[in-house]
UniProtKB/Swiss-Prot annotation:
Residues carrying sugar: 211
Region feature Disordered, mapped onto this chain: 142-186
Biased composition (Basic residues): 169-183
Top-tier EC class: transferase
Molecular function terms from GO: beta-galactoside alpha-2,6-sialyltransferase activity
UniProt-recorded name of the protein: Beta-galactoside alpha-2,6-sialyltransferase 2
Record's keyword annotation contains Transferase: yes
Protein EC: 2.4.3.1
Keywords attached to this entry: Disulfide bond, Glycoprotein, Glycosyltransferase, Golgi apparatus, Membrane, Signal-anchor, Transferase, Transmembrane, Transmembrane helix
Cytoplasmic side: 1-11
Organism encoding this protein: Pan troglodytes (Chimpanzee)
One cellular component (GO) term of this entry: Golgi cisterna membrane
Family per record: Belongs to the glycosyltransferase 29 family.
Amino acid sequence: MKPHLKQWRQRMLFGLFAGGLLFLLIFIYFTDSNPAEPVPSSLSFLETRRLLPVQGKQRAIMGAAHEPSPPGGLDARQALPRAHPAGSFHAGPGDLQKWAQSQDGFEHKEFFSSQVGRKSQSAFYPEDDDYFFAAGQPGWHSHSQGTLGFPSPGEPGPREGAFPAAQVQRRRVKKRHRRQRRSHVLEEGDDGDRLYSSMSRAFLYRLWKGNVSSKMLNPRLQKAMKDYLTANKHGVRFRGKREAGLSRAQLLCQLRSRARVRTLDGTEAPFSALGWRRLVPAVPLSQLHPRGLRSCAVVMSAGAILNSSLGEEIDSHDAVLRFNSAPTRGYEKDVGNKTTVRIINSQILTNPSHHFVDSSLYKDVILVAWDPAPYSANLNLWYKKPDYNLFTPYIQHRQRNPNQPFYILHPKFIWQLWDIIQENTKEKIQPNPPSSGFIGILIMMSMCREVHVYEYIPSVRQTELCHYHELYYDAACTLGAYHPLLYEKLLVQRLNTGTQGDLHRKGKVVLPGFQAVHCPAPSPVIPHS
C-alpha cells in the first residue's frame, strides 16, 4: 500500500509543478508589453492637470496660477520650454506649409478638449502628425493610396476583413508614434502639464479665419465671461446695435472717425482745480509726431514670441510700442531692443515690485498709463475711487521728470473703443475695458501710416505661457476672461491686410494707419425748403 501512496504523491507533485509552470508561461505571455508605455488613467490629461496644486495669489485673470520669476529674470531658451508637450503648435517651415494647405480638415475638428468631457488628447490632436500635415498636399491622395492600402479610383477596394501588409505596417507605425508621444509627455513632468494648451489646432485655424465664438471656449472661460457680464462692475449700459456686417474699409473709417486718442489735459474737473493744466505735457500725445511715422511695430508680451527670431525685423520699424514691464534685455533675438512707446496699466505705477520709480524700462520712452474707470466716464467718481491709484505716482513722476512725455488716457477714449468692439460683435462682450494690447494698437494706428502687430493673434507657436518673461500660464491670456480679448482679436483679424503666411509663422497682422485710410466725405445735410 505504501509504494502506491508514494507513487501517487509523486504524480500529484509533478502535476502541481507542471500546472504552475504553465500558469507562469501564460501570465508572462499576456503581460509582456512595452514597459515605457504608461497605464491609462481614468482621468483625461486636462482633468489630471486640474488636480495639481494652485500656487501663488489669484491674478487679475480669473483662475490663474502664478509662479514668480526666478531671480535675475529668465533666459528665453533655458528657463522656458519651447513648446507644449504634444508638440501641436511647434512646426517647421515645411510643416507650416502643409498645415496651411490642409485647411479643409480643420473645420470639422473639436475645438477644446474640455468641451466633451473625459476624452484623451488624441480626440483633438492627430495621432500621426506627418499624416495630418500631409493631408491636402498635391499628390497626397495618390501617395496615400499606394502606401496606406487605399484603392485608386476605379479599382476595387479590399474585401471586408482583409488587412493588407501596408495597412498593418501603418498601424504599427502609429502605435510606435503614440508610445513615443506618451513617454515624451511623461518626461516633461509638471512643466509639460502647465504648457498643455487648451487651444486645439482647429480653433487656432478658425481664429486665423475670424470664425470663432465664445461657445467654443472651455467651460472655465465661459463661466468667467458670464460672471463678468452679471457683475457689470463698471456700470456699462450699451445702447447701440450689435452687428458685424461692416466691410474692412467701413470699419477702418468708423475707427478713424470715432477712436480719437484722448488724454487728460487738466481742463476738466476735478483736475482743473488741482493744477493739472501745468502738470501734463504741453504737447498732446496725438501731436508728438505731426507728420506721422511711416512704419510702426506693436510687440505683444505673449509667450508665443519666444524662439521667433523676430527681433531684427521689429527693430527695423520707425517706432516700437511695448507693454507694461516687458523687458528686452536677454530677449533681443526674439523681441528686439528698440522701445519708443510703453503702455502701462495702473498696477505698474502702484505695485512696488515693478520698480516704476527707478527701473530703466520706464526711462527715455513715451509713457501712456491707463486705469479702468466707470462707463459713464465720471472723472470725479474715478478720481475718488480708481481701480489703482495712479494719480499720486503720476504727479510725482511728472515733477521729477518734466521733460519725459507721460500721459494718462481719458476714460472716454477707452470706453469708446469698447463701444466699437461691441457694435461690431453679435455676441454680448465682457463689460470691462479693452486690453492694453488693443488700446496700444489703436494708439499706433493714429500715429503711423502702417502698423505691424506681433503675436496679438497667435502664431503656430501659441502656448498658454502668458508672458515671455515670466512663468505664468493661463489660456485667458490669449482668449480673455476679464478683457473682451477674443472679440478684440476678431475685429483686428477683419482689419488685417497682411499675408496668411505672416499670420501663421510670425503671428503678425498688418494694419493701415488712419493717415493712409481714405474715407468718403459725409453727405451734406440739405435743408428742407
